[in-house]
């Protein structure tokens, strides 16, 4: 939801491409690929590295390979948003598509955020990496980025980035961070499994398998706005109007309550 106002305010002309099939709760890769085959040379194509926000449906390694080949063929430039590295399958696994494209393509943009995987949400720590085809293009892009930065914040705060730097350069702290990130990833996966099992028991006629197939914090439950409103007003369960739920906001102790509430509004 943030991409459209952010990129639009930068003066870019925006076009969307198909991605998520809401009816079947899955990535509509054929429709996505068909749309990307129409992208002109040098256009940017925004892609999520992993743990897609808002739907949780990620590209497979084979699909990343197809898009990489298409980028070579069409000449468009991938712009990869990596805000949840480590919450999907692992640090290396979640960066598969990014690393593949960096090896194969001449140009690439990568926006990385440490807000979630370092717990630095209020510090706004992150960075933009630009890979250019040659030194001349790299210098031109750097000049433009410096001009933009000067107009936005001039000198960014260093506290959050300094914390990331300390953790990365300390073997002990880095191991601890990796273990804590693993713990959080396993917690989210456990919550997904518990929610799926609870809903399967309460509503056996509906397929909630997408909950365990998807990755990261978010999934769409496929509810109507009326059902979402009832959950909020009658059960104090909050989610966005399109039924995007934050899996990480659940707890095992409250899964049964959530499943009971969902059964109530769905069967009404």
Question: Where in this protein do the model-derived segments appear?
Answer:
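PLP-dependent enzyme catalytic core of the Aspartate aminotransferase-like
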Residues: 34, 136, 197-202, 223-268
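Conserved PLP-binding catalytic core of the aspartate aminotransferase-like
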Residues: 176-234
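Helix C-cap/helix->beta junction micro-motif
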Residues: 10, 73-74, 104
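Hydrophobic beta-strand scaffold residues
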Residues: 14, 78, 108, 238-239
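Structural signature of PLP-dependent enzymes
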Residues: 142-161, 167-196
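Substrate-binding/gating loop at the entrance of the active-site cleft, primarily
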Residues: 1-12
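Active-site PLP attachment segment
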Residues: 97-140
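Active-site phosphate-binding strand-loop segment of PLP-dependent enzymes
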Residues: 21-87
């Amino acid at each position: 939801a943030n991409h459209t106002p952010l990129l639009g305010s930068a003066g870019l002309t925006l076009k969307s491409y198909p991605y998520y099939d809401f009816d079947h709760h899955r990535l509509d890769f054929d429709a996505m690929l068909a749309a990307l085959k129409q992208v002109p040379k040098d256009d940017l194509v925004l892609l999520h590295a992993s743990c897609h926000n808002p739907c949780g449906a990620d590209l497979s390694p084979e699909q990343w390979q197809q898009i990489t080949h298409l980028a070579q063929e069409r000449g468009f430039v991938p712009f990869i948003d990596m805000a949840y590295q480590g919450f999907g399958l692992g640090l290396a696994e979640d960066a598969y598509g990014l690393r593949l494209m960096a090896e194969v393509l001449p140009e690439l943009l990568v926006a990385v955020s440490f807000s979630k995987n370092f717990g630095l949400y209020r510090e706004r720590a992150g960075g933009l990496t630009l890979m250019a085809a040659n030194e001349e293009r790299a210098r031109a892009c750097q000049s433009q980025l410096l001009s933009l930065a000067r107009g936005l914040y001039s000198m960014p705060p260093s506290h959050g980035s300094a914390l990331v730097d300390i953790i990365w350069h300390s073997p002990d702290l880095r191991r601890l961070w990796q273990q804590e990130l693993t713990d959080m990833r396993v917690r989210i996966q456990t919550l997904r499994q518990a929610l799926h099992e609870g809903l399967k028991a309460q509503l056996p006629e509906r397929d909630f398998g997408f909950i365990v197939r998807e990755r990261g914090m978010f999934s769409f439950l496929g509810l109507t706005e009326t059902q979402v409103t009832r959950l909020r007003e009658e059960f104090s369960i909050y989610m966005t109007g399109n039924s995007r739920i934050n899996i990480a906001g659940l707890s095992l102790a409250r899964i049964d309550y959530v499943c009971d509430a969902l059964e109530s509004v769905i069967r009404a």
